[in-house]
Structure formats: C-alpha cells, structure tokens
Amino acid sequence: MKDAFSESKIAGIKLRNRIIRSATHEGLADDFGNPTEELIKKYEDLAKGEVGAIITGYAAVMQNGKSPLINMLMIDKDEKIPYYTELVDRVHQYNTPIFLQITHCGRQTFSRTTGMPTVAPSPIKDKLYNEDIPHELTDSEIDEIIKCFVIAIERAKKAGFDGVQLQLSHGYLLSSFLSPHMNKRNDKWGGSTENRFRIVKKIMERAREKVVDYPILAKMNGYEKSKDGIKLEEALIIARNLEKASCDAIEISCGIAEEGFVGIRGEFPFDMIAQHNHLMQKMPKILYPFIKPVLKHSFASPEPRYLYNLDSAIEIKKNIKIPVIVVGGIRKLEDAYNMIQREQCDFIAMSRPFIIEPTIVKKFKENKQQQSKCIDCNYCQIGVEKTPVKCYYGKM
C-alpha cells in the first residue's frame, strides 16, 4: 500500500518519500540572480531533513519577467549555469532530487524593477501591483518568451537539475495566458481554452525537441476566485492538455495574486502589510484604522483554511494518468497519510511548514511530531517583499 513515506518516482526520478518542498521564494539570490551560499545551505538543510524532493524558488527566464520581491533567482544567461551546478551538486550529496521552477512574472512586477515595461497577454492593469497598464504582447514577443523558456529548460538540464517546473499558477505570465480573467485576446493566443493554452503547448513542443525526455513538471490553478477566472471544469481540460503535451507531473494550487490570500490561507497580516507593502506606505497612517477592515474584507482568505486544493486534485487525478501533487494547507501527518493511502493524490507539497521547520519530514517519519508548528500568520509572505524569507511566528 502507498503511504507518505514510500519510495516513488516522477519521470524516472527516485524520491525517498512522497512529501515535496513546494516552490518558495527565498530572496537569497545575489544581485545578478545567482544562488548564494546561504541559499544552498537552506536547500542542504531541507535535504538533510529527508524531504522527498525540492522545488526551488522561482527563477525568471528573462529580465522583463523579474519579480519585484527581493533577490529573485534568474536563469536568463548561460553564465549562471556554474552557480546552479554548485547548488545541485550540494543537494545531490544527500540523495535528494531538486527541480528548478521557471517563470516570467508578466504584469506582476514593476517597470522600475525590470527596467522595462510590464507585459501581459492583454492590457489589463493588475489590481495588486497597481503598475501602469501592461503592454499587450505581440506575436513576435510571445515567440521570444517561448524561446526563453525553452533555453531556460536547457540550462537547467546542463546545470544538473533533475527537472524543471513551469509556473502556470498564481497570476504570473503563463498563468495569465491560461486564465480568461487576464487573457481577453481574440487571436490565436486567446478566446478558447485551446488558444489560451497555446503558449504552454509551444513551450512543451520546442522543449521536447531539445531535451527529449527530461522531466518537465507544471504548477497550475485548480480554480480562481474571480468570476471570469479558471474554474475546475476548465482546469480539467488544462490538465488533460498538459498530459497530452508530455508534462510529467502536475502540482495543483489556486488563485492569483490580486485575489488576496486565496492561495495561501490563514490570518490577515495587516501590521506586516502596513510595514512592507508599497501601496500602504503611500497612505497616511491616520487612515489605517479605516483601511484595515476594508482590506480584510476584500483580501482575507476564504474557507476552508486547510486542504483547500484537495477537491480539485481529486477530480484532476481522475482525469489524467500522470502524477498529481497537491499543495495548500497541509499541516498534519494524518492528512498526508490519508491523502496518499486513499489515492486522492500521488504526492503532497508544502511551503510554509518548511520555513519554520526544514526538518519536518524527518520529524514526521520518526513520529516525533504529528503537525507542523506553522500558525499560518502569513507574515513570511509579506516580509519577503523586502527581506529574505523567514518565520516571524506572528510577531513583527
């Protein structure tokens, strides 16, 4: 019988167990987007803690796709490969697979960060980043982005990563192409689900020509809060399309950034937002008592607080044969066991529990702990805008 600690494989890559560290922005790259010694040590700690596999924090495939969050990884130049090779070799010493998540932030950034205009499938302003209306990508610009994703996959392979994960969730560029909420085009890149999926399909086709059977995973939304966003019915179609496009495994998440704490449930960290968020810093503090209830109503996380992507993962797993990974509000060892034993998913992924306890998998395995110490205060999610990721445990 399968259980959370049984050995398993993704695209032939052996995992010691079925618990994965989901992609988490650490804010520990250097000024050029190369991994630093401090970041490598964080990954070594995860590997020593016996995690099944690590998915790195996101790495941008080109300069105009760079995140406004501090010290993002970049995979936009060949010169970066040796830095990543060092990272991979250090993690592999502990027999832990590591996958590089690659992305383009699209409209979820600032032109002052990238030095270029923000871009998107459609000229729709992001409500959270509040940047100028993004430039609508042309055919040739879309083709250049596809090329950059493919080259990034080639670089990841050369660096020794066990595979890559395409970031198709949370409102970043590929996510915004997939979502009818953000993609209002009426050409071959918009309209039908097939057209909105076209950019992902092209990335997969061209990547397979270059790297053949190199593992390519994807992280996608099972649903979005926006009325015209992706719903489960369309997520099933996208998942089937990913399988047809030779994707090796799919991680199920939800939500986009401007929808607030949909994809990362828990407490509404107003004090942390007031101190770190660029929009709040422009407002007079005298208005904070009036702003707080409005923001909490608009952006606070909905229910349920835990296992909130499980229903989507169950339905998607029924429709595809490749492995399904579920992330979101997984905090108890019992839940991890149940999801795997009941075959509701093939793997589980966590993010915040690893921020507070890099060795949580080892503690689970040795039965020293039954639940994560994470209190879902979400301070870490806001603090990383300006400082490297850490657990605040609900305190400033």
What are these regions, as identified by a protein language model?
Residues M1-M396:
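Flavin-dependent oxidoreductase catalytic cores
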